[in-house]
Structure formats: structure tokens, C-alpha cells
Regions:
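Residue-identity detector for glycine
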Residues: 17, 50, 60, 82-83, ...
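Amphipathic alpha-helical packing elements
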Residues: 25-71
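N-terminal acidic leader/helix
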Residues: 1-35
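Short intrinsically disordered terminal tails
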Residues: 1, 71-94
Length: 94
């Protein structure tokens, strides 16, 4: 199943070597204005679920890095436009 229909990607965890793609993961662009709030909600849910403290802390540091990045670039309202619409909503071209 294509979880992320907007992006094709291959990501490798440099510590454990696990590989992730658009089949089992998703991408949030750091420039998107909604990302800090989305990460804060994720962090809160991780706390509720009992994730280990290091994971909670790493999310907090990620939120700070995203905010710092956004302060140095033109952050934008996220969008899905043009040909992305048919792919993201209807799964065309998968």
C-alpha cells in the first residue's frame, strides 16, 4: 500500500539500517507551517501511549529544529495541487 502518495522516497535509518519508503512511511516538509503543530500532537500522543522518554525528547528537539528552519526560510501553507490531486486523492499513477 502506498501510504504517502505525494512523495516517492527511500529513507535509511543510519543507526539500525532499517529502510522506509512511501509504501510504509510519510514525509512532512519542514517548510510547511502546519508541521510544528502536527509534531506537537504526535509528541503528546506518544506520551499518552507510553513511548520511552528518549523518543519524547527527540521529538521535542525535532520540533525546535523545524521551528528554527522555518524562521530562516519562507514557510508555506501546505498544499496539494495540479497532478498531485489525482494521485493523492484517487491513487492515480500508483
Amino acid at each position: 500500500m502506498n501510504i504517502d502518495r505525494k512523495f516517492k522516497f527511500l529513507a535509511v535509518n543510519p543507526v539500525n539500517g532499517h529502510i522506509y519508503t512511501d509504501e510504509d512511511a510519510l514525509v512532512l516538509c519542514a517548510k510547511d507551517k502546519a508541521v510544528p503543530v502536527a509534531l506537537e500532537a504526535y509528541q503528546k500522543e506518544c506520551v499518552r501511549l507510553g513511548a520511552n522518554p528518549e523518543h519524547i525528547e527527540s521529538i521535542g528537539k525535532l520540533i525546535q529544529r523545524v521551528k528554527e528552519y522555518q524562521s530562516s526560510v519562507k514557510s508555506e501553507v501546505p498544499d496539494t495541487v495540479g497532478g498531485e490531486i489525482a494521485r493523492c486523492i484517487n491513487g492515480e499513477g500508483l
